[in-house]
């Protein structure tokens, strides 16, 4: 590296003794002026001397700042309140003492301040806890003053209303007063108190609160329609369970309805018969299912038309079960599959399979499904049994 005409400065002879001597001169500068001739004895250049003076001054200032921080931290730890570094410690202690005395002397019965439990319910006796001793005291709202706890300060504001609700339950006029005062209670008063002091007297509080709770929780009766009311079809579908046969009070008409359902008779009118007894008919159908249905199967309707009697299911012919099994899902290998007829034909299917019975099979199923939906009577018999009876009756004709 070319240095040109630069010449190295002479080596400096400096040690700790010269540092202490220089610091003594700097520390006494407040009392008297510094003599410039004293710098000659250090035998250093002026630039180095000024640099050393600045370093010593900065070191002293950093030490002073560290001592101030330590003193401030010690005062904060010892005193109850933080004391600023510029103020004396005595005034800080005096202000902290006044704040503590103000907190001790000020009453804390506001509604917002309070770590106490919420207000007790009006249907239970007020349980007050003495702060000095850990015992619980039961106080009646009519005769005793308010609880000393800070959270129950609002009990005195609603005194009349609370007293009416806490009167004895046995007397008749008191019950009327309680019933008039109960709708005015707020939701907080209705909810039972979660405080731990209620567990001390479970028997007395529960015995007194049971009738009151039964009155408060009692719901208004639901709307009950008249006995002879007419229901729409939608209401019948919602009120009746699914797949439950309709049973009228008379056994004769129920026998005719169920018999016509098995034989596939068309309904007399487009609308389903209305209920005559409302909801009791549902309970009757639940209890008398087996008896009514068995009676319906045994009895024969008193009709002059003999064509309906010929439709009653008789014994199956020996050829018909083979055809039925051929059309069942288990007999798909014989070529009677419906999926093959709808889509691509199966291996054994031909035009000879499409006889009258197989052509009318889908029409019979659709008619039976629509008939059962309109009548709402598909409980005891499955669709396969009903279809089998319909199919055999039509084939016997």
UniProtKB/Swiss-Prot annotation:
Q: Which UniProt keywords apply?
A: Autophagy, Protein transport, Transport
Gene for this chain: ATG29
Which protein, by its recorded name, is this? Autophagy-related protein 29
Bias class Basic and acidic residues marks the residues at: 300-309, 330-341
Q: What happens when the gene is disrupted?
A: Significantly decreases the radial growth of colonies under nutrient-rich conditions.
Q: What GO cellular component is one of the record's annotations?
A: phagophore assembly site
Q: Where in the cell is it found?
A: Preautophagosomal structure
Region of interest (Disordered), ranges: 71-397
The family note in this entry says: Belongs to the ATG29 family.
Domain of life per record: Eukaryota
Q: Which residue windows does the record flag with biased composition (Polar residues)?
A: 245-259, 343-363, 381-397
The family database entries (InterPro entries) matched by this protein are listed as: ATG29, Atg29_N, ATG29_sf
Keyword Cell cycle belongs to the record: no
Tell me the organism.
Answer: Gibberella zeae (strain ATCC MYA-4620 / CBS 123657 / FGSC 9075 / NRRL 31084 / PH-1)
Q: Which GO terms describe its biological process?
A: autophagosome assembly; protein transport
Which cysteines in this chain are paired by disulphide bridges? none
**Subunit info?**
Forms a stable complex with ATG17 and ATG31. Interacts directly with ATG31. The ATG17-ATG29-ATG31 complex interacts with the ATG1-ATG13 complex. Note=The interaction with the ATG1-ATG13 complex is induced by starvation.
- Main role? Plays a role in autophagy. Functions at the preautophagosomal structure (PAS) in order to form normal autophagosomes under starvation conditions. Also plays a role in mitophagy. Autophagy is required for proper vegetative growth, asexual/sexual reproduction, and full virulence. Autophagy is particularly involved in the biosynthesis of deoxynivalenol (DON), an important virulence determinant.
Q: Compositionally biased, Acidic residues: which spans?
A: 230-240
User: Where are the compositionally biased (Basic residues) regions?
Assistant: 269-282
């Amino acid at each position: 590296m070319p240095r040109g005409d630069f010449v190295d400065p002479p080596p400096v002879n400096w040690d700790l003794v010269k540092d202490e001597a220089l610091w003594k001169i700097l520390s006494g500068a407040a009392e008297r002026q510094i003599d410039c001739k004293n710098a000659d004895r250090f035998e250093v250049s002026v630039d180095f001397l000024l640099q050393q003076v600045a370093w010593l001054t900065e070191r002293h200032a950093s030490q002073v700042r560290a001592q101030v921080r330590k003193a401030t931290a010690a005062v904060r730890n010892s005193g109850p309140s933080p004391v600023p570094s510029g103020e004396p410690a005595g005034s800080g202690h005096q202000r902290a003492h006044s704040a503590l005395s103000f907190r001790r002397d000020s009453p804390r019965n506001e509604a917002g301040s309070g770590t106490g439990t919420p207000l007790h319910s009006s249907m239970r006796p007020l349980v007050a806890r003495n702060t000095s001793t850990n015992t619980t005291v039961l106080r009646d709202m009519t005769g005793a003053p308010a609880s000393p706890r800070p959270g129950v300060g609002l009990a005195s504001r609603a005194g009349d209303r609370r007293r009416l609700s806490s009167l004895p339950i046995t007397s008749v006029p008191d019950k009327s007063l309680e019933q008039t005062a109960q709708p005015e209670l707020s939701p907080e008063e209705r909810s039972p108190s979660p405080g731990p002091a209620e567990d001390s007297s479970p028997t007395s509080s529960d015995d007194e609160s049971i009738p009151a709770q039964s009155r408060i929780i009692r719901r208004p009766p639901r709307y009950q329609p008249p006995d002879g009311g007419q229901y729409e079809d939608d209401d019948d579908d919602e009120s009746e369970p699914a797949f439950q046969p309709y049973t009228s009070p008379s056994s004769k008409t129920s026998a005719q309805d169920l018999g016509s359902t098995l034989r596939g008779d068309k309904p007399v009118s487009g609308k389903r018969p209305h209920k005559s007894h409302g909801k009791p008919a549902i309970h009757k159908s639940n209890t008398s299912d087996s008896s009514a249905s068995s009676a319906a199967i045994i009895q024969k309707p008193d009709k002059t038309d003999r064509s309906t009697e010929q439709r009653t299911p008789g014994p199956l012919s020996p050829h018909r079960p083979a055809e039925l099994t051929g059309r069942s899902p288990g007999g798909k290998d014989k070529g009677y599959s419906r999926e093959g007829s709808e889509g691509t034909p199966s291996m054994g299917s031909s035009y000879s399979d499409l006889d009258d019975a197989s052509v009318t099979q889908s029409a019979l199923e659709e008619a039976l499904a629509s008939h059962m939906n309109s009548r709402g009577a598909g409980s005891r018999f499955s669709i396969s049994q009903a279809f089998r009876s319909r199919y055999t009756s039509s084939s016997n004709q």
